[in-house]
Amino acid sequence: MKKVTARWAAGLSLGLGLALCAPAWADNKAAAIDEMAGYLEFVDYGGATIFPEQIPKGEYAKMMVIDARDAAQFSAAHIPGAVNIEWRQVLAKSSQIPKNKPVLIYCNTGSLSAQAGFALRVAGWDNVRILQGGFAEWQAKGGLDANARAAGAQPKH
């Protein structure tokens, strides 16, 4: 009987605790939604993305380059000078990310890095650019030499 009463009391306590926390969670969720809505209201179309061809080779040294893929993919290959911060961890490790210099973030294709970049922008980083097409397109376009290749390309008639 004591076990049943103890379980019932524990369940009641848990239920009351969750009920009391629900309003605070709802307020936090509403605040987060308001913050995202405010960001989306004023962000430039395409302002957060950059193509590999738009980055001159010398500019990489002036940026913090974040590889948002997992550690195994980063170990296999990455943009020279990049640091590995998995896309889910950018806010948890935001103290490592400067606000006073350009930040380039990429993943394999650009989709996960776009989420990480969005989170950083909403959190106050207005210096973040997402590498359009990710690491795969960066490699396909010539890597560090993508800008030079694009500048030297002749239009086909």
Where are each of the predicted segments found?
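Active-site flanking residues adjacent to catalytic metal/cofactor-binding acidic residues
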Residues: 66
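Residues within alpha-helical transmembrane segments of multi-pass membrane proteins, especially transporters
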Residues: 15-21
